[in-house]
A protein has these predicted regions:
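Conserved NTP-binding catalytic cores of kinases and kinase-like/nucleotidyltransferase enzymes
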Residues: 150-248, 252
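Sec-dependent signal peptide recognition
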Residues: 2-10
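A conserved helix-loop-beta module that forms one wall/lid of the active-site cleft
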Residues: 242-276
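Middle-to-C-terminal accessory/interaction subdomains
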Residues: 168-170, 196, 208, 212, ...
Length: 537
């Protein structure tokens, strides 16, 4: 996907007084800004647009008269109000007593003149939103509307070619093999680079997924690179999604995470992978979870800690809390004894506070409640079987700070793709995160948190706030499937598992379309169930 917004600056306007936009009316003579003529040309030609970027002093737009008719334009924003109206309404435009346009009750000092031709008019207000129309309000009363043209649906998703130096498959999760990676994206689906190549090391990754025929991989480049306009780093992952026959559950969960606003959401894109010349299907290429300034941005050297909750207990330092939560040090992976003692005491104190008779007065000093609420929403909405503080959960603890659910990970057996909940309910029904803790039903952190009326009130308020954004996820899923084009068909030619049970599928269908339809059906039903139940708490 082409990068949609490089910078999100909501306001590019010079304010010199509380009642007007722009400079003093005494010396300001309205005129068309530099670059506006190309916007006029694009509007007259009926062009849509595919890319937009905003800086403090200009707007740059890639218009599209069609797939093969690129037309770019850049315009100065001097004396123009511009805002991102995602999730909000544009400001009201009106005319003041002097006959000048006002935006949101503030005068622009630009006269309204309906006699002006579009070619003579002056822009004074611009609104935009991701994936929506771009609107330019001009002084003759017209609004130039440019439809969003989504070129992500054209062409093929990127191809990733992995070649090991020994030309053999990858059999180990511990030992890296050396080799080369080549990424080809001639259709510019997700970045402007057509081809990237580098030397690398590669090994297997994952727990249960490593035991499946289609293997997931961990890649470490010899030099840092900013792949697919993600973070600049050496370490990357290829998720196989073997048991997720929709191929988009992890992608969908990260989109929900992005909308909820977690401190970090791992970026992911779908790709097709070739290993030593053999086609291996559709994978999800993503940022590896790690501490860095562009990923988990904490200061380990200063005493901050990244923890993982994981029953596998496969890190160097692991322990179970007094209430049965399986903790591990993720970074630092070899903590000092002082850090170990501090961490164990912190969780002991937190759980003691949480199970205290007057817990509502004390537990909040240990946790960042907002992140715990968002974690509950995404894990409960997806009914992620691993999300009940049992596996693949990540928390940060800043020195002298509060415990934060920093990011989420691993959703391939969520959203109707699990058959072992053990609650006897359909996958879109029943509480999971709220009631089913890591140490059994009615015994976990969230079970106690929901005994606090204030916590419940905050959950309900947050749910009402994000519910409209969650309602549009099905359309996002359908778009993501369209972006992949014919790649899923090739994937299931390589892996002939449609119509066959793969652990832990709740439902087995006979086509890719039916797999996507099941994901959409389950998500829609779960969202409706959640909305009813959360508001009734």
């Amino acid at each position: 996907m082409k990068q949609f917004f490089k910078t999100l600056l909501l306001l590019a306007v010079l304010m010199t007084g509380c009642d007007q936009i722009g400079p003093s009316a005494d010396n300001y003579k309205p005129k068309q800004p530099e670059g506006f003529s190309r916007f006029q040309t694009a509007y007259a030609a009926g062009y849509g647009y595919s890319e937009l970027s905003v800086s403090s002093d200009s707007i740059r737009v890639a218009f599209d008269g069609g797939p093969n008719q690129p037309f770019t334009a850049a315009m100065s924003l001097e004396h123009i109000l511009i805002e991102d109206v995602s999730g909000a309404s544009p400001k009201i435009t009106a005319v003041d007593s002097q006959g000048c346009w006002m935006v949101g009750g503030v005068s622009t000092k630009i006269p309204k003149d309906e006699k002006l031709l579009d070619s003579q008019a002056i822009p004074f207000y611009i609104t935009y939103a991701e994936g929506a129309d771009l609107r330019v309000y001009v002084s003759n009363g017209n609004v130039f509307v440019y439809k969003f043209y989504d070129n992500r649906f054209e062409g093929e998703i990127p191809k990733v070619y992995l070649t090991t130096d020994d030309r053999q498959d990858i059999y180990s999760k511990e030992e890296y093999k050396t080799g080369k990676i080549v990424i080809k994206d001639p259709d510019h689906k997700f970045w402007k680079t057509e081809e990237f190549s580098a030397t690398m090391r590669i090994r297997g990754r994952g727990n249960s997924t490593w035991g499946m025929p289609k293997k997931p991989y961990k890649i470490k480049l010899d030099e840092k690179a900013r792949l697919f306009d993600m973070s600049s780093d050496k370490e990357w992952c290829l998720l196989a999604n073997y048991c997720d026959k929709s191929l988009v559950r992890n992608l969908t969960a990260m989109e929900i995470s992005r909308r909820l606003g977690f401190s970090w959401t791992p970026k992911m894109v779908p790709v097709e992978v070739y290993l030593n010349g053999r086609y291996d299907g559709v994978y999800t290429f993503c940022e590896h979870k790690k501490v860095s300034s562009e990923r988990v941005d904490i200061d380990v050297d200063a005493g901050d800690i990244l923890f993982e909750i994981e029953q596998q207990q496969d890190e160097i330092v692991c322990w179970w809390t007094d209430h049965g939560c399986p903790m591990m040090f993720s970074d630092p992976d070899e903590p000092t004894q002082e850090q170990i003692d501090f961490a164990k005491q912190f969780f002991r104190d937190f759980e003691t506070a949480l199970w205290n008779k007057e817990f509502t007065k004390v537990y909040s000093q240990y946790i960042d409640k907002a992140s715990f609420i968002d974690y509950f929403i995404i894990q409960e909405l997806t009914k992620n079987v691993d999300g009940n503080l049992r596996k693949s959960s990540y928390l940060t603890l800043p020195k002298d700070g509060k415990l934060e659910m920093y990011f989420v990970w691993d959703f391939d057996i969520s959203m109707g793709n699990c058959d072992y909940y053990g609650d006897g309910l359909k996958p879109w029904e029943g509480w999971w995160i709220k009631d089913q803790g890591c140490n059994g039903r009615y015994h976990g952190w969230y079970y106690r948190l929901f005994m606090d009326p204030n916590f419940v009130s905050e959950v309900k308020a947050r749910w009402k706030e994000v519910y409209p954004q969650l309602q549009t996820i099905p359309q996002w899923i359908e778009d993501e499937v369209k972006i992949m084009g014919a790649a899923p068909e090739r994937n299931f030619e390589r892996w002939n598992i449609l119509g066959i049970y793969v652990w832990p599928n709740y439902k087995v269908t006979g086509s890719y379309k039916a797999e996507v339809d099941w994901l959409l059906e389950n998500y829609t039903k779960r969202l409706a169930w959640m909305n009813t139940q959360v508001l009734a708490l």
